[in-house]
Amino acid sequence: MELWKKSLKELSDLVKSKEVKPSEIVEAFIERKNQVEPKIKAYVTALDDLALEKAKKRDQELTKLENIPDLFGLPIAIKDNISTKDIKTTCSSKMLENFVPVYDATVIERLKSQGYVITGKTNLDEFAMGSSTENSAFFPTRNPWDLERVPGGSSGGSAAVVASGMAPASLGSDTGGSIRQPAAFCGVVGLKPTYGRVSRYGLVAFASSLDQIGPFGRTVEDVAMIMNVISGKDPKDSTSRSIPVPNYLESLNKDVKGLKIGLPKEFYTEDLNPQIKEIILNAVKQLEKEGMTAHEISLPYTKYAIETYYIIAPSEASSNLARFDGVRYGYRAKEYKNLEEMYSKTRDEGFGAEVKRRIMIGTYALSSGYYDAYYLKAQKVRTLIYQDYMNAFEKVDVIITPTTPDVAFKIGEKSNDPIQMYLSDIFTVSANMATVPALSIPCGFKDNLPVGMQIIGKPFDEETILQVAYKFQSLNDYHKRFPEV
């Protein structure tokens, strides 16, 4: 039995039936990691010894437990912008290269309460700014399906560990597509929950009105299992909402017959790669055979989503990243003559090029002469995008689009052209703007590379998108395919 090929749900069942010990599972994933990690480089910090130690502890606890939690003893990887107590949290930046938090993020506390085992901290674009994980200050992560290509970003490490079988599941964060785009590029399932569904406490902030933590898994069940644990109100995060959390796992089997799918014409234009379009529409046809109906809809203001996003997100980032000044924690420049020089040198040496670019864009958009023309206007357009989605959801239950305009691109292909890089999030950013939940699920291959289908739902209705994704998964075997690394 190759344990590293099992899904999180399958591993959970094996632990609950006591057929397999947590330590055996963790050992299998460490062995797999030792084989493929040198080629992929998905971990900033691998925690093999700690994981084994925790797993052996779980072995002993298992003998005494009557009610075994779903994630008990299961290995999960964590994106390195989520605070883990006593474990380095670098945000893949020189600025936080040696930063060790003194507290856990709420999502980590919730996973710990289930008895999960952390496998390590995964690589990302520095401070989650990027779409390829090439902006990591340490090294780029490679796509397990083709080592010459990017895994997507910013949660590229989290997607790559799951795709390559180094961990059965992981956590990422999504500000403009940072869970869904890498999930699509790596051929795994990734969910960005509704804004406010999962606590952001302990997530290093990039754009506070857009960021959300979410899970990656091999299957829809895996993602549902993690959502059951991490969702819900948190007194430490005032933006988290006290809307009841359903049992996502138990409701997966609900019949999707009669549900209406919206296909936004703005997403299926001439610019969309014809092969991608065909793969997505074939997937929709499969769902129609199951009793769902497809309808063309319009989301007129989404065509301004990228421009709006690249004003709002950098503006919030310029404010959030002001705290990294060399005074309290993180990197501090070695030589400086006065306080002002310490600030400027620390930030110049500590931040990478893309982070500096976004801080400058954001500072410009917020500056007194331009605030109304840029930031205020962008907020108004954001409201119109939100309204587009709300109008559409009066007519349909879910919206289906491609997750990305094309499959994973080559490493270095877009790094000198920020606009091209930004456009790889063209289909994902509007869901963040509208705060709605959205999931990417593998739905085919183009040139032997995975293609992702995005399923977008009503606010706080992750349940329906998971049900539609689960139905689609049951008709296909994409979740059972592994890259040859």
Swiss-Prot record:
Q: Enumerate the InterPro entries for this protein.
A: Amidase, Amidase_CS, Amidase_dom, AS_sf, GatA
- The first-level EC class reads ligase
Question: GO terms for biological process?
Answer: translation
Keyword presence, Ribosomal protein? no
Q: Which UniProt keywords apply?
A: ATP-binding, Ligase, Nucleotide-binding, Protein biosynthesis
Q: Which PROSITE patterns match?
A: AMIDASES
Keyword Signal tagged: no
Q: Which Pfam families match?
A: Amidase
Quote the EC number: 6.3.5.7
Q: What catalytic activity does the UniProt entry give for this protein?
A: L-glutamyl-tRNA(Gln) + L-glutamine + ATP + H2O = L-glutaminyl-tRNA(Gln) + L-glutamate + ADP + phosphate + H(+)
- Superkingdom is Bacteria
The GO terms describing molecular function are:
ATP binding; glutaminyl-tRNA synthase (glutamine-hydrolyzing) activity
Q: Name one GO cellular component term.
A: glutamyl-tRNA(Gln) amidotransferase complex
Residues at the active site:
79, 154, 178
Where exactly are the transmembrane stretches of this chain? none
Describe the subunit structure: Heterotrimer of A, B and C subunits.
PANTHER family associated with the record? GLUTAMYL-TRNA(GLN) AMIDOTRANSFERASE SUBUNIT A, TRANSAMIDASE
Q: What is the annotated role of this protein in its UniProt record?
A: Allows the formation of correctly charged Gln-tRNA(Gln) through the transamidation of misacylated Glu-tRNA(Gln) in organisms which lack glutaminyl-tRNA synthetase. The reaction takes place in the presence of glutamine and ATP through an activated gamma-phospho-Glu-tRNA(Gln).
Q: Which family, according to the similarity comment?
A: Belongs to the amidase family. GatA subfamily.
What name does UniProt use for this protein? Glutamyl-tRNA(Gln) amidotransferase subunit A
